[in-house]
């Protein structure tokens, strides 16, 4: 009986080790709703833990003073740091008065101090990136994005939808946990997952 109890306890601990432990902000629920337009079964609790990694502080300070766009910044509550959608992104104003956003095939999510000094950067390849993000505490960010696993000639793709949990530790390190939900044969043209696609009042999307 005691042995059975220990086995059950270990199993319970293993299950909870990979359970979600992140606070998903209501500001990002639109992203879940967008995915539900192609898969009604998707829920936050369906995302499974897939990876834990760390990002170290930049070895040398890099200033981006006067090179960043305010609309791409989100400040933490204390106001001493901000996260930046993509440090490679640029904005162009169109004749309509709205903006188009462009950048490199690869993207980079950055965290800066109030003087626009780059503290941390998370690099993504051309198939992977962040759609939107939100501070939930002064030292914690929840971000959402996707990774294109396979692309097919008919225009469909197998996608890992990803929730990122960024925890900024004292001592110059960020712990990143990733939670994924896979959907096969997705027509990405039917989805508006990037936050700029939700702001038709400000942006024009190609």
Annotate each predicted stretch with a short phrase.
Residues 4-15:
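Sec-dependent N-terminal signal peptides
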């Amino acid at each position: 009986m005691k042995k059975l109890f220990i086995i059950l306890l270990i199993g319970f601990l293993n299950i909870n080790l990979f359970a979600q432990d992140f606070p998903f902000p209501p500001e990002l629920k639109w992203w879940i709703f967008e995915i539900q337009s192609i898969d009604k079964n998707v829920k936050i609790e369906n995302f499974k833990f897939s990876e834990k990694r760390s990002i170290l502080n930049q070895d040398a300070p890099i200033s981006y003073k006067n090179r960043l766009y305010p609309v791409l910044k989100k400040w933490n509550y204390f106001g001493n740091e901000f996260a930046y959608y993509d440090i490679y992104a640029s904005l162009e104003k169109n004749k309509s008065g709205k903006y188009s956003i462009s950048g490199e095939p690869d993207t980079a999510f950055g965290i800066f101090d109030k003087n626009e000094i780059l503290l941390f950067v998370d690099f993504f390849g051309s198939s992977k990136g962040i759609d939107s993000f939100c501070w939930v505490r002064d030292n914690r960010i929840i971000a959402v994005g996707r990774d294109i696993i396979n692309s097919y000639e008919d225009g469909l793709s197998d996608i890992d939808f990803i929730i990122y949990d960024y925890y900024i530790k004292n001592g110059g390190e960020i712990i990143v946990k990733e939670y994924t939900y896979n959907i096969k044969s997705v027509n990405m043209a039917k989805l508006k997952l990037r936050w700029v696609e939700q702001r038709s009042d400000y942006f024009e999307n190609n």
